[in-house]
Amino acid sequence: MDFHLIIKSAWEGYDSSKTIRDIEDISAMVSTNHVYRITFHDEDIIIAKLSFFGKFEHFKEDHRIIQSLSNNLLYPFENLLSKSLLKNNRVYVYRYKHGKDDAWVVFYNPTRMLDRLPRRLNNEQIKKLGTQLGKFHKACSRVKNVLPKSSKTLRTDIYDLQRQLEKNPDKFGNADLIKHHCEQFLKNRSRYNMKSFEIIPVFIDWNIGNFSVTPDLDLYSRWDYDWFRMSYRLLDFYFFSRVVSDAGDRTVFSYVIGPMMEERFITFLKEYHEVNPITADEIRFLKEAYRFFILNYVIKDGKYFFNEQYAKKLQTEAVEIYLPSVDRDFDAEVIIKALKLE
C-alpha cells in the first residue's frame, strides 16, 4: 500500500482547497499503526492516523466515541484528548479500498505536550498519579451516558479468539493452554458482581510515552488511542502498575504480572481509592483483566499491534510466562487487605 497516496486522497476528500507540502512519518516503531505529521503550504500542521487492522466499523465507532468524550469532558480534563477534524459536524473518517487493500484514515489537531514522567517514579509521584487517574476515571464516568454506544465487549473478543482456535489450532502455539485460559476468563466473569462494575471509556495502554503532565503532575494531554474501548476501569490498572513499578517504564518491555503485586502499585491504588473508591470484587477481577489483555491484545491481535519482532517475542512469552503466571502469581487478597476493603 502507498500510505502517502492514501493520506493525500483522504485529505482531498476532506478539503481539496488546502494543499499538502510534506508528510512525515512519526509512528512509534513498536506498532504497526501509522501516524503522520502533515504540513500544508500555508504552514498549518495536523496529524493523520492510518490503520488497516480489524474492522472499519470499529475504527469509525471508536473515533466517534473518543471525539464525543473529548468534547464532553469537563475541567480540568477538557483539553486532555486530541480533537478529530470534523466534516459536516461528524468525525471525518476516510476509507481506502482497492483490491485486497483496505485502510482507514482519521485526522487530528496536534496534541499540546508538557512534561513526561521520569522512567522511574518516586513515592510522591506515584501518589499523585493515583489521585489523577482516580479523578480522570470519575470524569469519564460522569459523561458515559452521553457517549455513542459501542458494539465491542470483552466477551465478543474472547469468542473471536476461540473461533480462530477452532479454525486453526496451530495459529498461536499451545492451543490447549490458550483455550483453557479463554474458558477460565469466561467462567470467572460470573464469579464477581460484575453487574455493579461501571462501563466507562478506557485507553488501556498507558506508558510514559503517550501522556504528558503539568509541573504539578496533573494529567495534561493524552495521545495514542489504539486500544481504546468502552469497558471496565480495571483494564487501565495493569499498565499503571508498570508505570509505577520498581523497574520503571522500559523501552524493551515484557508484560509480566509482577508489577501488580508490588508495594508501589498498592501505594498507587490507595491514593486512587481515596478519590474514587474501588470494591473488593473489582480488585479480584484485576487478574481477569490481565488475562484478557494477554489473550486479546498479545495473542489474538499482537501481530497487528506490534511490529513482527516484538509480536513474536511477546506471543512466545505469553504462552511460556504470562498465562501460566495468572493464577499462580497474583493474590488479590493482599491488595484487598492493604486497602482495608474487607
Label each residue range with its predicted role.
Residues S31-F40, I47-A48, K187-L235:
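Active-site acidic catalytic loop and adjacent metal/ATP-binding pocket
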Residues H41-V143:
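ATP-binding pocket architecture of kinase catalytic cores
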Residues P118-D176, I199:
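A cross-family kinase active-site recognition segment
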Residues L235-N276, R291-E308:
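Active-site activation/catalytic loop segments of kinase-like enzymes and analogous catalytic loops
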